[in-house]
Amino acid sequence: MDQVFAAIDIGSNSTNLLIVDQSGKTLERVVRSTRLGANIAKTGALSAEAIQRTLDCLREYEVLVKRHNVSHRRTVATAACRVAKNTSQFFTEAKKISGTEPELISGETEGALSFV
């Protein structure tokens, strides 16, 4: 059986999904403007509205992950989640959708992965 891989990148401005087969062929690529980091500089927290937008997006992506019978996935969260004081609350809700908690990656790792 072929393996299918999914990568979800939860960023400050957008949430990206990439699904590929084991040969590297793109099966699905979706980018949604979720603005998770909106107003974080003022409040230090992810807003309820931004969290809801991002969770709605993750629900949409979960449908695609299931449709493609994804066997391996990695979900990462970047800058906004590194600085927000309520990241754990967001991660708890995100885990309810996919069964896995997003991985908070460093700025250095984020930079390295942007070239992959």
Model regions: which residues?
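Nucleotide/phosphate-binding catalytic cleft detector across ATP-hydrolyzing
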Residues: 1-10, 18-116
